[in-house]
């Protein structure tokens, strides 16, 4: 497995807080941040907080799976970061390892930050296996442009506890700590201990939740497909279902 130093990790008041701190630490007025669409409603608002510009990326083939061509044709000299949430809120689409490998190589070569929101990465279906974006990095955590965000909210059903974290190089983590220090100081010590218990505890609860969600997906798809004129995208993970 991967090993990180404490100085390469920041713990925040939820994954949302971590995402916001990452954007505030990396972007400034006039920068552009690419976000594959449809996307979680908070991403563009976080980008706007620092005066940067959210740039929706719409796959030309009409699917929920962007191709590298969709990404690269939206890149300009102002592009500072790309946000990837896989599997995705709100579609449940999980991007292929090949696509993630391509986007890692692209971001490393162009010096663009790749913000990976892994909040749903263990809640995936049909035999899919979670993987770390760092397996595709050619550089160390200290040198790469990858930032990984996660939380206890979804995988451990700890939404109300507000505990999340981000992994990146020491310099950026220090900047994020400075920002967070003037926002919330830090997350509750109690919830931090509870999160440690969840992470180090028996992980069968995550698999049980995953199986429940996969069964729920089956029921949801059956119900939606029974309606005339309704098309539903079969999600690869999460607890969302995007119907048309």
Please state what every model-predicted region is.
Residues 7, 24-86, 97:
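PLP-dependent aminotransferase-like
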Residues 61-129, 134:
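Active-site phosphate-binding strand-loop segment of PLP-dependent enzymes
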Residues 196, 211-221, 231-244:
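Conserved glycine-rich beta-strand-loop-beta hairpin in the small C-terminal domain of fold type I
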Residues 50, 109-110, 227:
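Helix C-cap/helix->beta junction micro-motif
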Residues 1-32, 140:
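Phosphate-binding glycine-rich loop
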């Amino acid at each position: 497995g991967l090993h990180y130093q404490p100085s390469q990790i920041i713990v925040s008041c939820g994954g949302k807080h971590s995402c916001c701190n990452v954007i505030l630490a990396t972007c400034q007025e006039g920068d552009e941040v690419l976000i594959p669409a449809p996307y979680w409603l908070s991403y563009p608002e976080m980008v706007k907080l620092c005066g940067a510009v959210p740039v929706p990326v719409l796959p030309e083939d009409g699917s929920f799976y962007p191709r590298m061509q969709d990404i690269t044709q939206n890149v300009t000299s102002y592009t500072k970061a790309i946000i990837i949430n896989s599997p995705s809120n709100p579609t449940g689409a999980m991007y292929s390892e090949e696509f993630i490998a391509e986007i890692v190589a692209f971001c490393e070569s162009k010096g663009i930050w790749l913000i990976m929101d892994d909040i749903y990465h263990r809640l995936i279906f049909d035999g899919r296996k979670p993987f770390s974006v760092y397996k595709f990095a050619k550089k160390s955590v200290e040198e790469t442009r990858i930032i990984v965000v996660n939380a206890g909210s979804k995988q451990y059903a700890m939404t109300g506890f507000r505990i999340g974290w981000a992994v990146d190089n020491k310099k950026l983590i220090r900047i994020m700590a400075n920002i967070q220090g003037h926002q919330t100081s830090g997350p509750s010590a109690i919830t931090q201990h509870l999160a440690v218990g969840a992470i180090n505890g028996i992980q069968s609860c995550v698999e049980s939740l995953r199986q429940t969600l996969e069964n729920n997906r089956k029921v949801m798809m059956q119900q939606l497909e029974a309606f005339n004129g309704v098309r539903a995208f079969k999600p690869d993970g999460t607890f969302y279902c995007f119907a048309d």
